[in-house]
Amino acid sequence: MPCDILTVNDTKYTVLRLLGKGKGGYSYLVTDGRAQYVLKQIHHEPCDYYTLGDKLQSELRDYKTLRTLGIPMPELGYASSPKERILKEYIPGPTVAELLKAGQPDPGWVAQVQAMCTRLYPAGLNIDYYPTNFVPRDGTLYYIDYECSAYMEPWDFEHWGLPVWTAQAAERTEDA
């Protein structure tokens, strides 16, 4: 990161750390001195397996769609079109991926994702079911990405997401 201060709509945020990189951007944990947030900086790096148009508008549109469906997600704070940045609520805690690798699965997580699917599939949608995109907090599993895509059975939770979750839990068993 060439700088440790990023702005969204003229407000400065200090970068605390990189949270992760996805196909659409880099997510940073930032603070304004009062609270912590996630700031996503859209990137334009090539992705062999996915084609995205206007990534910022796509994320904002997907956020509205998923919110309307009642998917538990972090609140959208602000978006800055010129700098292609999104500021959203920070859901503290480890991701499902981290917890699976630590040998701390919760069977309620699968049921919560399946409940999300009962809303998503009839709307013709999938989300990115990769376990790094979910954070449990106070009994609720949050989908911390804003991405959704057209439903395709090979990429739904039962055919893609659940096997990935199971494989990550198995990695823990093999490493132990």
Predicted regions and their residues:
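Hydrophobic residue at the +6 position relative to the catalytic HRD Asp in the kinase catalytic loop
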Residues: 129-134
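Juxta-kinase regulatory segment immediately upstream of eukaryotic protein kinase catalytic domains
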Residues: 1-16
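Protein kinase-like catalytic core scaffold
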Residues: 37, 72, 86, 142-144
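ATP-binding glycine-rich loop module of kinase domains
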Residues: 15-57
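The N-lobe alphaC helix and its flanking beta3-alphaC-beta4 segment of protein kinase-like domains
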Residues: 51-69
